[in-house]
């Protein structure tokens, strides 16, 4: 991270976005992740940023909006949410497209339950433009929450959501800076980001395998995984109910493995 980097607080970031007349979009949050849009409302001036918020907690209500799903806290569910919300936004507000950078943020989250018998984790995604009228980009990530309190996990998730939206508009030129900024306002060890993918016309030059390596390098996660096609994977999902054989290897360079 640059020595000139100044960490900015959650409220300041949210207010900065709210006061930028070019950035306008929607938030869709299902499950326990209901804190991201709340940060923008609390900062003031939210009418300059928020066109729509959708909040669903009951599974049947969620199904009525996004269709039935076998798993709710999963990447396919997140992608369905982003697709629906961004299409709806760009269709309904097409008259603004010449001066607006649209975005649709979504998350689907499970936080620690009352009995603390589960593990808090969630999927977060953002489809966004970096200039008015341009094709959209996408940022998708998976988080594991380590706070031993459900409310603390929700608040941490809310901060990451603000950091995502602020980061793509201010740090997209520097992937490592963007990655580190996602944890602004969060103490060490509270959140683990074990998968992150950037895609779209403004990120064609980005190799997401190297993004995964940066997550490990910067201590944001302990392991990175990607398939033979180069696509990054969320390890626990990819290895679920699989028989695993591990062989020691070396990476020279990082994009090739030698066994």
Question: Where are the model-predicted features located?
Answer:
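Non-catalytic terminal extensions that flank enzyme cores
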Residues: 1-251
């Amino acid at each position: 991270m640059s020595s000139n980097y100044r960490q900015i607080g959650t409220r300041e970031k949210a207010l900065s976005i709210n006061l930028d007349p070019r950035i306008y979009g929607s938030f869709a949050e299902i499950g326990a992740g209901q804190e991201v849009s709340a940060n923008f409302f609390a900062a003031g001036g939210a009418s300059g940023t928020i066109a729509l918020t959708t909040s669903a907690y009951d599974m049947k209500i969620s199904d009525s909006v996004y269709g039935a799903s076998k798993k709710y806290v999963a990447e396919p569910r997140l992608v369905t949410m982003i697709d629906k919300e961004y299409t709806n936004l760009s269709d309904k507000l097409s008259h603004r497209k010449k001066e607006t950078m649209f975005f649709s943020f979504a998350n689907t989250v499970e936080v620690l339950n009352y009995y603390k018998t589960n593990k808090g984790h969630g999927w977060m995604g953002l489809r966004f433009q970096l200039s008015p009228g341009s094709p959209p980009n996408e940022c998708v990530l998976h988080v594991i929450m380590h706070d031993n309190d459900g409310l603390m996990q929700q608040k941490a998730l809310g901060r990451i959501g603000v950091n995502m939206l602020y980061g793509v508009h201010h740090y997209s030129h520097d992937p490592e800076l963007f990655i580190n900024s996602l944890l602004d306002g969060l103490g060490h060890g509270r959140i683990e980001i074990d998968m992150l993918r950037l895609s779209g016309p403004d990120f064609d030059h980005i190799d997401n395998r190297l993004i995964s390596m940066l997550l490990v390098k910067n201590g944001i996660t302990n392991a990175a995984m990607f398939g033979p096609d180069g696509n990054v994977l969320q390890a626990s999902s990819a290895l679920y109910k699989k028989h695993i054989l591990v062989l020691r290897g070396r990476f020279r360079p990082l994009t090739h493995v030698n066994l």
